[in-house]
């Protein structure tokens, strides 16, 4: 470390030790908590299946910042820069539309070989991979229904796509030695008030059971399901609601995905984690930033991001919660978006690990809520930034906003040529 950072580090460690926090133990734990970065920030959820395709499914990437990735080589290059600017362990989350093939591949015919380059790249960079079937931006999802479709042939197509996706996910886990979390999200819903809310959910229930019927090694693959309140064009009814998927995950013992933008604006997923963990074996978190709706803005180091991290740490959910990000902002440099959001998630985890939780819990048990509030507020002023800077330097990444210099240089040399 440089002298100034080392001096600040030593003083900060003393301050935290005075309140009973072991900084070295906190950093050791932080190094066991990978954050899964989402590939789709790099190209506005376009994928490689049809570069001229239109994004559908009630989601939207707004903006036209130049330099978005147009193929897998460009996307991996962009990711490599982002990864080099973020300290600690990372993973990469892929959608099925990011397959690589010289010939068109139907979604229900995808195979592990279509993702072999991603696996080789992940091995090189010591990354785990996660996966998602892509039930959107396709002619057979154009009417707003996939796994709950009333047409059995269309429904079967999406069942087969999800089944094929599970095999790809298991391939990731087997090849990389770390389980791939495969999350199923579907856009199914209606713009206006439906007469029959039950039948689509009955079809979805049966379809999901068929999707997960093949037994896969849990050391290689983990199933997750994700709810949503509404989407563009599905404002009045969403088949896969919170209640539906909470019941499904609890009864089938799959993981449950909680997306920060998929609930009413007055709801927060940090308050849902402890309840859900009583009933499901695992949680997948999609940390995002909804602005008035599921806008998928870049994650900030704000109160909710901190609360999410604190819930994981306070309840020792390290082995049961999988931390992923889900945002896509096309109005700013896409590599910078990755770096900002992922560094913020890691900062939140570090701050949570530096909290004197045992001391605060004892105050709560004694009913001393005055001291609890006082210490909660005072610990916000402890020098966690000095620990963060030391952690960045130990991981050979820029300590502060100097990471932006690398992004600007890459933008001038590489992105401007696209």
UniProtKB/Swiss-Prot annotation:
Keywords: Cytoplasm, Isomerase, Manganese, Metal-binding, Rhamnose metabolism. GO terms for molecular function: L-rhamnose isomerase activity; manganese ion binding. Mn(2+) binds at residues 262, 294, 296. Homotetramer. One of its GO terms (biological process) is L-lyxose metabolic process. SUPFAM superfamilies: Xylose isomerase-like. Binds 1 Mn(2+) ion per subunit. Its cofactor is Mn(2+). Its main location: cytoplasm. It catalyses: L-rhamnopyranose = L-rhamnulose. It is found in: Cytoplasm. Catalyzes the interconversion of L-rhamnose and L-rhamnulose. Pathway: Carbohydrate degradation; L-rhamnose degradation; glycerone phosphate from L-rhamnose: step 1/3. Its EC number is 5.3.1.14. Coiled coil: none annotated. Belongs to the rhamnose isomerase family. Pfam families: RhaA. GO terms for cellular component: cytoplasm. This is L-rhamnose isomerase.
